[in-house]
Swiss-Prot record:
Residues 44-56, 83-95, 121-145 have a biased composition (Pro residues). GO terms for molecular function: DNA-binding transcription factor activity, RNA polymerase II-specific; RNA polymerase II cis-regulatory region sequence-specific DNA binding. Sequence-specific transcription factor which is part of a developmental regulatory system that provides cells with specific positional identities on the anterior-posterior axis. Binds to sites in the 5'-flanking sequence of its coding region with various affinities. The consensus sequences of the high and low affinity binding sites are 5'-TAATGA[CG]-3' and 5'-CTAATTTT-3'. Residues 209-268 bind DNA. The proline stretch works as a part of the transcriptional activation domain. This is Homeobox protein Hox-A4. Transmembrane segments: none annotated. It comes from the Eukaryota. It is found in: Nucleus. Residues 17-148, 267-309 are annotated as: Disordered. It comes from Gallus gallus (Chicken). Its main location: nucleus. Residues 274-294 have a biased composition (Polar residues). Coiled coil: none annotated.
Amino acid sequence: MTMSSFLINSNYIEPKFPPCEEYTQHSGSAGSSASYHPHHPHPHAPPPPPPPPPPHLHAAHPGPALPEYFPRPRREPGYQAPAAPPGPPGPPPEALYPAQAPSYPQAPYSYSSAGSAAPGPEQPPPGASPPPPPPAKGHPGPAQPLLPGHALQRRCEAAPAAGAGTGPGCALLPDKSLPGLKGKEPVVYPWMKKIHVSTVNPNYSGGEPKRSRTAYTRQQVLELEKEFHFNRYLTRRRRIEIAHTLCLSERQVKIWFQNRRMKWKKDHKLPNTKMRSSNQPSLGQQQAKAQTQGHPRPLDGAAPNAAAL
Protein backbone atom coordinates (compact mmCIF):
# COMPACT_ATOMS: atom_id res chain seq x y z
CA MET A 1 0.00 0.00 0.00
CA THR A 2 2.84 2.37 0.82
CA MET A 3 4.63 1.70 -2.44
CA SER A 4 1.52 2.13 -4.59
CA SER A 5 0.60 5.45 -2.96
CA PHE A 6 4.16 6.66 -3.37
CA LEU A 7 4.18 5.83 -7.07
CA ILE A 8 0.87 7.59 -7.63
CA ASN A 9 1.65 10.78 -5.70
CA SER A 10 5.29 11.22 -6.76
CA ASN A 11 6.57 12.54 -10.05
CA TYR A 12 8.39 9.34 -10.79
CA ILE A 13 9.10 8.90 -14.48
CA GLU A 14 8.36 5.37 -15.63
CA PRO A 15 11.05 4.20 -18.09
CA LYS A 16 9.74 3.22 -21.45
CA PHE A 17 11.14 0.35 -23.43
CA PRO A 18 10.43 -0.68 -27.00
CA PRO A 19 7.54 -3.10 -27.31
CA CYS A 20 8.30 -6.78 -27.63
CA GLU A 21 6.58 -7.06 -31.01
CA GLU A 22 9.44 -5.24 -32.69
CA TYR A 23 11.89 -8.07 -31.92
CA THR A 24 9.83 -10.63 -33.81
CA GLN A 25 9.49 -8.67 -37.05
CA HIS A 26 11.63 -9.76 -39.98
CA SER A 27 12.23 -6.37 -41.62
CA GLY A 28 12.83 -2.95 -40.23
CA SER A 29 13.23 -4.19 -36.70
CA ALA A 30 16.86 -3.16 -36.42
CA GLY A 31 16.21 0.34 -37.70
CA SER A 32 13.27 0.85 -35.44
CA SER A 33 15.20 -0.40 -32.41
CA ALA A 34 18.18 1.81 -33.23
CA SER A 35 16.12 4.94 -33.92
CA TYR A 36 13.79 4.44 -31.02
CA HIS A 37 14.54 6.80 -28.12
CA PRO A 38 12.19 7.23 -25.23
CA HIS A 39 11.32 10.70 -24.04
CA HIS A 40 14.14 11.25 -21.60
CA PRO A 41 16.14 14.35 -20.93
CA HIS A 42 19.23 15.08 -23.01
CA PRO A 43 22.10 12.70 -22.19
CA HIS A 44 24.53 15.61 -21.68
CA ALA A 45 22.30 17.30 -19.15
CA PRO A 46 22.74 16.24 -15.55
CA PRO A 47 20.09 13.90 -14.24
CA PRO A 48 17.28 15.65 -12.42
CA PRO A 49 17.31 15.33 -8.66
CA PRO A 50 14.81 12.94 -7.20
CA PRO A 51 11.58 14.68 -6.25
CA PRO A 52 10.97 14.88 -2.54
CA PRO A 53 8.16 12.78 -1.24
CA PRO A 54 4.93 14.63 -0.52
CA PRO A 55 4.49 15.71 3.08
CA HIS A 56 1.09 14.13 3.41
CA LEU A 57 2.64 10.70 2.70
CA HIS A 58 4.88 10.95 5.77
CA ALA A 59 2.01 12.18 7.86
CA ALA A 60 -0.27 9.37 6.75
CA HIS A 61 2.33 6.64 6.99
CA PRO A 62 5.01 7.50 9.52
CA GLY A 63 8.08 5.35 9.38
CA PRO A 64 11.43 5.03 7.67
CA ALA A 65 11.58 5.99 4.05
CA LEU A 66 12.23 3.42 1.38
CA PRO A 67 15.66 4.22 -0.01
CA GLU A 68 15.59 1.52 -2.65
CA TYR A 69 13.06 3.40 -4.76
CA PHE A 70 14.91 6.76 -4.86
CA PRO A 71 18.11 5.82 -6.69
CA ARG A 72 16.19 4.31 -9.58
CA PRO A 73 15.77 7.59 -11.51
CA ARG A 74 19.52 8.11 -11.24
CA ARG A 75 20.26 4.71 -12.70
CA GLU A 76 17.65 4.83 -15.45
CA PRO A 77 19.35 7.53 -17.52
CA GLY A 78 22.59 5.57 -17.34
CA TYR A 79 21.10 2.88 -19.51
CA GLN A 80 20.75 5.31 -22.41
CA ALA A 81 23.82 5.24 -24.61
CA PRO A 82 25.65 8.58 -25.12
CA ALA A 83 24.92 10.53 -28.24
CA ALA A 84 26.86 9.14 -31.14
CA PRO A 85 26.48 9.21 -34.89
CA PRO A 86 24.17 6.46 -35.99
CA GLY A 87 26.18 3.57 -37.28
CA PRO A 88 25.23 0.84 -39.67
CA PRO A 89 22.16 -1.10 -38.67
CA GLY A 90 22.92 -4.16 -36.61
CA PRO A 91 21.93 -7.68 -37.49
CA PRO A 92 18.26 -8.55 -37.23
CA PRO A 93 17.06 -10.02 -33.95
CA GLU A 94 16.56 -13.36 -35.63
CA ALA A 95 20.31 -13.68 -36.09
CA LEU A 96 20.96 -12.83 -32.45
CA TYR A 97 18.10 -14.89 -31.10
CA PRO A 98 17.53 -17.81 -33.46
CA ALA A 99 14.55 -20.01 -32.99
CA GLN A 100 15.43 -22.70 -30.50
CA ALA A 101 14.67 -26.01 -32.13
CA PRO A 102 15.11 -29.23 -30.12
CA SER A 103 18.20 -31.11 -31.14
CA TYR A 104 17.04 -34.66 -30.43
CA PRO A 105 14.75 -35.14 -33.48
CA GLN A 106 17.52 -34.05 -35.85
CA ALA A 107 19.39 -37.34 -35.51
CA PRO A 108 16.84 -39.52 -37.38
CA TYR A 109 16.55 -36.95 -40.17
CA SER A 110 20.31 -36.66 -40.50
CA TYR A 111 20.57 -40.44 -40.86
CA SER A 112 17.83 -40.69 -43.44
CA SER A 113 18.97 -37.67 -45.48
CA ALA A 114 22.69 -38.51 -45.46
CA GLY A 115 22.57 -40.09 -48.91
CA SER A 116 20.50 -37.36 -50.57
CA ALA A 117 21.36 -33.68 -50.84
CA ALA A 118 17.80 -32.36 -50.51
CA PRO A 119 16.05 -32.90 -47.20
CA GLY A 120 13.05 -35.19 -47.15
CA PRO A 121 9.46 -33.98 -46.88
CA GLU A 122 9.42 -35.12 -43.26
CA GLN A 123 11.67 -32.24 -42.12
CA PRO A 124 9.59 -29.68 -40.16
CA PRO A 125 9.86 -25.93 -40.75
CA PRO A 126 12.43 -24.12 -38.60
CA GLY A 127 9.85 -22.05 -36.73
CA ALA A 128 7.40 -24.85 -35.85
CA SER A 129 8.00 -27.55 -33.30
CA PRO A 130 8.71 -30.83 -35.11
CA PRO A 131 6.39 -33.79 -34.52
CA PRO A 132 7.81 -36.92 -32.91
CA PRO A 133 9.89 -38.88 -35.42
CA PRO A 134 8.24 -42.02 -36.85
CA PRO A 135 10.04 -45.33 -36.42
CA ALA A 136 12.52 -45.66 -39.25
CA LYS A 137 12.67 -49.04 -40.98
CA GLY A 138 16.25 -48.76 -42.22
CA HIS A 139 17.69 -47.01 -39.19
CA PRO A 140 21.44 -47.71 -39.20
CA GLY A 141 21.91 -46.70 -35.55
CA PRO A 142 22.62 -49.30 -32.85
CA ALA A 143 19.49 -51.05 -31.67
CA GLN A 144 19.01 -52.44 -28.19
CA PRO A 145 19.16 -56.25 -28.07
CA LEU A 146 15.77 -57.82 -27.57
CA LEU A 147 15.23 -60.60 -25.11
CA PRO A 148 14.16 -63.97 -26.50
CA GLY A 149 10.71 -63.56 -25.01
CA HIS A 150 10.15 -60.18 -26.69
CA ALA A 151 11.45 -61.44 -30.03
CA LEU A 152 9.18 -64.46 -29.84
CA GLN A 153 6.20 -62.28 -28.98
CA ARG A 154 6.87 -60.02 -31.97
CA ARG A 155 7.12 -62.99 -34.31
CA CYS A 156 3.88 -64.46 -33.08
CA GLU A 157 2.14 -61.08 -33.32
CA ALA A 158 3.25 -60.72 -36.93
CA ALA A 159 2.23 -64.29 -37.76
CA PRO A 160 -1.57 -63.73 -37.94
CA ALA A 161 -1.04 -60.86 -40.39
CA ALA A 162 1.02 -63.09 -42.70
CA GLY A 163 -1.44 -65.96 -42.80
CA ALA A 164 -3.16 -68.72 -40.88
CA GLY A 165 -0.54 -71.29 -41.82
CA THR A 166 2.02 -69.88 -39.43
CA GLY A 167 -0.01 -70.67 -36.30
CA PRO A 168 1.59 -74.06 -35.53
CA GLY A 169 5.04 -72.55 -36.03
CA CYS A 170 4.49 -70.15 -33.16
CA ALA A 171 3.36 -73.00 -30.96
CA LEU A 172 6.65 -74.81 -31.56
CA LEU A 173 8.87 -71.75 -31.25
CA PRO A 174 9.13 -71.64 -27.42
CA ASP A 175 10.68 -75.13 -27.28
CA LYS A 176 13.43 -74.16 -29.74
CA SER A 177 14.10 -70.50 -29.02
CA LEU A 178 13.99 -70.57 -25.21
CA PRO A 179 16.44 -73.26 -24.08
CA GLY A 180 17.69 -71.13 -21.17
CA LEU A 181 14.30 -70.96 -19.48
CA LYS A 182 13.97 -74.72 -19.36
CA GLY A 183 17.36 -75.11 -17.72
CA LYS A 184 16.07 -73.36 -14.60
CA GLU A 185 13.57 -76.12 -13.87
CA PRO A 186 14.76 -78.79 -11.43
CA VAL A 187 16.01 -81.91 -13.15
CA VAL A 188 14.81 -85.20 -11.65
CA TYR A 189 16.91 -88.21 -12.60
CA PRO A 190 15.62 -91.79 -12.42
CA TRP A 191 17.78 -92.65 -9.42
CA MET A 192 16.17 -89.76 -7.51
CA LYS A 193 12.69 -91.23 -7.79
CA LYS A 194 11.21 -93.58 -5.21
CA ILE A 195 9.14 -96.43 -6.53
CA HIS A 196 6.79 -98.10 -4.07
CA VAL A 197 5.44 -101.33 -5.55
CA SER A 198 2.77 -103.24 -3.67
CA THR A 199 2.55 -106.16 -6.11
CA VAL A 200 5.30 -108.20 -7.74
CA ASN A 201 5.88 -107.39 -11.38
CA PRO A 202 6.77 -110.49 -13.40
CA ASN A 203 8.48 -108.37 -16.08
CA TYR A 204 10.75 -106.67 -13.55
CA SER A 205 14.34 -106.92 -14.81
CA GLY A 206 15.99 -105.89 -11.56
CA GLY A 207 17.63 -102.74 -12.88
CA GLU A 208 16.28 -100.58 -10.04
CA PRO A 209 15.60 -101.76 -6.49
CA LYS A 210 12.06 -101.73 -5.21
CA ARG A 211 12.90 -99.76 -2.08
CA SER A 212 16.21 -98.44 -0.86
CA ARG A 213 17.44 -99.48 2.57
CA THR A 214 17.49 -96.76 5.21
CA ALA A 215 20.91 -96.01 6.64
CA TYR A 216 20.43 -94.66 10.17
CA THR A 217 23.06 -92.40 11.63
CA ARG A 218 24.71 -93.03 14.99
CA GLN A 219 22.68 -90.30 16.64
CA GLN A 220 19.42 -91.73 15.32
CA VAL A 221 20.31 -95.26 16.43
CA LEU A 222 21.32 -94.01 19.88
CA GLU A 223 18.02 -92.18 20.39
CA LEU A 224 16.01 -95.16 19.13
CA GLU A 225 17.89 -97.53 21.43
CA LYS A 226 17.22 -95.31 24.44
CA GLU A 227 13.53 -95.20 23.61
CA PHE A 228 13.43 -98.97 23.14
CA HIS A 229 15.09 -99.46 26.52
CA PHE A 230 12.13 -97.79 28.25
CA ASN A 231 9.28 -98.80 25.92
CA ARG A 232 9.41 -101.69 23.48
CA TYR A 233 6.08 -100.63 22.00
CA LEU A 234 5.29 -97.12 20.94
CA THR A 235 2.02 -95.29 20.75
CA ARG A 236 1.27 -93.35 17.60
CA ARG A 237 1.72 -90.04 19.36
CA ARG A 238 5.15 -91.01 20.66
CA ARG A 239 6.09 -92.37 17.24
CA ILE A 240 5.25 -89.03 15.62
CA GLU A 241 7.35 -87.17 18.19
CA ILE A 242 10.38 -89.40 17.61
CA ALA A 243 9.99 -89.16 13.85
CA HIS A 244 9.99 -85.35 13.99
CA THR A 245 12.92 -85.27 16.42
CA LEU A 246 15.13 -87.59 14.36
CA CYS A 247 13.99 -86.32 10.92
CA LEU A 248 12.56 -89.71 10.00
CA SER A 249 9.20 -90.89 8.81
CA GLU A 250 6.71 -92.74 10.98
CA ARG A 251 7.10 -95.80 8.81
CA GLN A 252 10.87 -95.88 9.36
CA VAL A 253 10.45 -95.62 13.14
CA LYS A 254 7.81 -98.35 13.14
CA ILE A 255 9.95 -100.73 11.08
CA TRP A 256 13.00 -100.10 13.26
CA PHE A 257 11.05 -100.99 16.40
CA GLN A 258 9.67 -104.13 14.78
CA ASN A 259 13.14 -105.29 13.84
CA ARG A 260 14.49 -104.39 17.26
CA ARG A 261 11.79 -106.44 19.03
CA MET A 262 12.58 -109.45 16.88
CA LYS A 263 16.24 -109.14 17.77
CA TRP A 264 15.42 -108.82 21.47
CA LYS A 265 13.33 -112.00 21.43
CA LYS A 266 16.08 -113.85 19.66
CA ASP A 267 18.66 -112.71 22.20
CA HIS A 268 16.46 -113.81 25.11
CA LYS A 269 15.59 -117.11 23.42
CA LEU A 270 11.89 -116.41 23.51
CA PRO A 271 9.58 -118.08 21.03
CA ASN A 272 8.50 -116.04 18.12
CA THR A 273 4.81 -115.26 18.31
CA LYS A 274 4.41 -115.18 14.55
CA MET A 275 6.17 -118.51 13.91
CA ARG A 276 4.63 -120.32 16.89
CA SER A 277 2.95 -123.64 16.10
CA SER A 278 -0.42 -124.64 17.50
CA ASN A 279 0.84 -127.81 19.28
CA GLN A 280 3.30 -125.90 21.45
CA PRO A 281 1.83 -124.70 24.74
CA SER A 282 1.64 -121.00 25.31
CA LEU A 283 3.74 -119.14 27.85
CA GLY A 284 0.77 -118.77 30.21
CA GLN A 285 0.04 -122.49 30.15
CA GLN A 286 3.68 -123.31 30.92
CA GLN A 287 3.68 -120.98 33.92
CA ALA A 288 0.43 -122.47 35.29
CA LYS A 289 1.85 -125.99 34.93
CA ALA A 290 5.01 -125.01 36.81
CA GLN A 291 2.94 -123.59 39.66
CA THR A 292 0.89 -126.78 40.03
CA GLN A 293 4.02 -128.90 40.09
CA GLY A 294 5.65 -126.83 42.84
CA HIS A 295 2.53 -126.93 45.09
CA PRO A 296 1.05 -130.50 45.14
CA ARG A 297 -2.58 -131.01 46.17
CA PRO A 298 -3.15 -132.08 49.87
CA LEU A 299 -4.25 -135.65 50.71
CA ASP A 300 -7.81 -136.53 51.79
CA GLY A 301 -6.79 -137.69 55.30
CA ALA A 302 -4.88 -134.55 56.02
CA ALA A 303 -7.85 -132.35 55.57
CA PRO A 304 -9.44 -132.99 59.02
CA ASN A 305 -6.13 -132.48 60.77
CA ALA A 306 -5.67 -129.20 58.98
CA ALA A 307 -9.16 -128.21 59.95
CA ALA A 308 -8.56 -129.14 63.57
CA LEU A 309 -5.46 -127.04 63.70
